Amino acid sequence: FQNAWVYRGSVVQCNRYFAPGACTGLTEPINNFEAIPPKDKDGNKTGEKVFVLCDRHCKGYYHWTHEQLPRLGIMYDRLIKDPTITITAPAKGMIMQYLTILGFPKSQVRDLYKKATSDRYPTAFYKTVYYPQPMRCGSILAPQLFLIRKIMFERLSLEAVRTKPVDKENMLVVMADRRDSRQPRNSRNITAMLKARFPNVEFVSHLGKDVKTQITLFNRADLVIGPHGANLGNIMWCKHGATVLEFVPIKTGNLCYYQTASKLDLQYRMLMVPLAIDVAHEVP
């Protein structure tokens, strides 16, 4: 687009408006959008070229890894070669860790996701706006999935395919844990029971580990076990043939992770648990 405003994940021109898709759909609120003059006296709201990456849901791990990050793959080579193209994304936390792994300095990232006032986010005007293909909610598109895997695996020297059969006596099991009500109340008992029954198996939790370590762990994993959420979006980095066991709430379950698993030839298993998605529960 030429000569457009960027407001969070949306692109606005005088006669049209583009929403980012994903789970935001067409509901990205622009009721508080304020079109600033193209030339701002402070010089900090205008720019030449920008790549609009994130929408308002990108701070969620699944939404970031499956609905925002894959959009970067289409423009990756150009963004690396031309650091004058600004990338819009929160410039901190796990998002900045991902962008750093992919080779983007913090100076190339612009955070338009902090409120400028109590009811309005910053607006920025750019002469050229790159806006990649929107993603669907809850179901990553296969071409973008394989493209971002290829890029990430090349950056971290990881493999996409197993080179030897699984040794059932010496497996790596990643326990995808959470710190909220989605985590089963008896999760510690489950882990203790599994460790006692399979003493030679390595059980590792991803909690507290940085993004690079998480990606590497899931890539090495033979089996991933965890509740809905719990950074299960990391199964997109698993090798083909790994097994995923997800604790799925009966009342509010969805097939987000099944969609990813099916595209990557992962062995997906579902264990139904009682109640709804954010209600404290135990795994039977």
Predicted features, each with a name:
Residues 1-284:
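The feature primarily captures lumenal catalytic ectodomains
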